[in-house]
Amino acid sequence: MRQLIACFGLSALLLTSVYADGYLWLSGAGEFPARIFRYNLRTGQIDRVVAPGEWGFVQSRDYNLLAYDGNDLYVGLENDRTLLKLNPYTGAFRSAFAYQMCNCFYGHHWMKDGTIRDGEIWRAAPGHNSSSPGILHVSTLAGSPTSAFYGMNRPDLQPIGLEWVGDALLITTASGLHRVNFPDEPLVFGAVEYALSGVPSGHVLGGLAYDPAGDALYLASADGNGATLWRVQLNHDAQTATATPVESLTLKGYPAGLQPTALGWVPARAGDANDDGCVDDADLLEVLFAFGSGC
């Protein structure tokens, strides 16, 4: 009996102190209809796959945005103004709405990665070709546009990944990592490219995500061999970025041939042993089962 009580106490302690690493949601551009994937930072596996195209809305080759506001995971389409809110842990559908703008925007620009800052959705919008300047699109959480910044005279600035890290706005293009600046000229953005080391040449850069609690910046990329997740250390003074591999995503369940154009971080809840976003009796039972054989 004493041994059983000790085992229960150990399990309860573990329940409150573990399972707090977090999750990264990834887009999967390159199939139709596309899907999104959840990478579990604790287990190192792709453990959830969600197919938004099955819900009856406009289908897309790239469901992206993947921004978390503390309650919902926001998902956007590359080719339509539809926006979705999902359960940030399970990916279950919650609601749908749309940008309050003409869908003609998508005739010349795509929408890609995004983030939420101070109650606004920031989104990377590359042109269909280099003759159209890249755009940083800003809207309210309800989808009402508030601003747009254009990479004028910078055909190299076609943003894909986008993330705020403190007061620094970072974007990726297919081949570079840049820190955005806003000159005095209205509605224009510029950028300084950081010297990125660690990512092999030939990789196409994709989404960015930031874990503020762990001060961890993540980058996803892909080449002909599959997709890779990186952790990036920034040196703003030297304008450098050093990438360290976290995982070969393709070896962990992310399909080969897809491009992770968007990345979104969601914090884990302490004690959530089964990774569903809820802390309940099922989590305690899972911990008891996992450690019961050693008691």
What residue ranges belong to the model's regions?
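Short loop/turn segments immediately following beta-strands, especially the blade-tip
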Residues: 39-43, 86-91, 138-143, 180-188, ...
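Blade-level signature of beta-propeller repeat domains, shared across WD40, Kelch, NHL, RCC1
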Residues: 225-228, 240-268
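Alpha-helical segments with a strong preference for the paired helices of cellulosomal dockerin domains
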Residues: 273-295
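Conserved beta-strand positions in repeat-built beta-propeller and related beta-rich domains
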Residues: 24-32, 75-79, 118, 123-131, ...
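An edge-strand/N-cap motif at the start of beta-rich repeat modules
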Residues: 18-44, 267-268
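Beta-propeller fold detector
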Residues: 46-54, 93-101, 145-153, 187-198, ...
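Structural motif
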Residues: 32-38, 81-85, 129-137, 176-181, ...
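Repeated scaffold domains used in trafficking and secretory/extracellular systems
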Residues: 56-70, 102-117, 155-165, 201-210, ...
